[in-house]
Amino acid sequence: MPLPEPLNIKAWVEENEHLLKPPVNNFCLHRGGFTVMIVGGPNERSDYHINQTPEYFYQYKGTMCLKVVDEGKFRDIYIREGDTFLLPPNVPHNPCRFENTVGIVVEQDRPKGVNDRIRWYCARCESIVCEEEFYLTDLGTQIKDAIVAFDSNIEAKTCKNCGHVNSSKREPAEF
C-alpha cells in the first residue's frame, strides 16, 4: 500500500470545522499505534481523564485551558495558539475548550492490561465523587458512554462528603 499524502490542517479545518462542534467535538485523523484527533470547542465536560500514557496537545487555533490535578492541587494550564504541551502519564486532566478553538491531541494506544480512568470531583468541596476504570479501545465512544452513565445515576453524582449533586457538564468555558 502506498504512503498517504500529507494532510493540510488549515484546509482540512476550513472544510470540516462543522465536525468539531458539540456534542462530539472531535474527529480522529489517525488510529493505529496512536490516535491523532482534531478537537474543537466549546465543550462542557466536568470529568477528569486519567491515562497511564502521555498525552500530547498542540493548540492550532485559539486558547484552551487544561484543568489538572498537580500533586494534589487543582490548577489551570493555558495552552495558547501555537503552543504545545506534553501531559505526563497519570495526571487527572479536564481539557476545557472555548468557542471557535481547534487543537490537535495525540494519544498512544493503550498496552494490554493498562486501564484508563474517568473521575468526577465535587464542584463544591473537590472530593472525588465517582471514578470508573476501563480498558480504552475507542476514544470516540467509551468516554461518552461513561459520561452518560454518570449523568443518569443520582447516587454516582452525589458527593459522599458534602451531599452536593454534581453534573457531567460544566458551564462552557470562556477566555
From Swiss-Prot:
Keywords from the named record: Cytoplasm, Dioxygenase, Iron, Metal-binding, Oxidoreductase, Pyridine nucleotide biosynthesis
GO biological process, one term: quinolinate biosynthetic process
Residues reported to bind Fe cation: 49, 55, 93
Keyword Lyase: no
Residue sites binding O2 per the record: 45
Cofactor: Fe(2+)
EC number: 1.13.11.6
Residues noted as binding substrate in the record, renumbered to the chain: 55, 97, 107
Enzyme class: oxidoreductase
Pathway in which this enzyme or protein is active: Cofactor biosynthesis; NAD(+) biosynthesis; quinolinate from L-kynurenine: step 3/3
Record field: catalytic activity: 3-hydroxyanthranilate + O2 = (2Z,4Z)-2-amino-3-carboxymuconate 6-semialdehyde
Compartments where found: Cytoplasm
GO cellular component term of the entry, any: cytoplasm
Binding site for a divalent metal cation: 122, 125, 159, 162
Tree of life domain: Eukaryota
Gene Ontology molecular function, alphabetical: 3-hydroxyanthranilate 3,4-dioxygenase activity; ferrous iron binding
NCBIfam families for the chain: anthran_nbaC
Family: Belongs to the 3-HAO family.
Function in brief: Catalyzes the oxidative ring opening of 3-hydroxyanthranilate to 2-amino-3-carboxymuconate semialdehyde, which spontaneously cyclizes to quinolinate.
Protein's name according to its UniProt entry: 3-hydroxyanthranilate 3,4-dioxygenase
Species this chain originates from: Lodderomyces elongisporus (strain ATCC 11503 / CBS 2605 / JCM 1781 / NBRC 1676 / NRRL YB-4239)
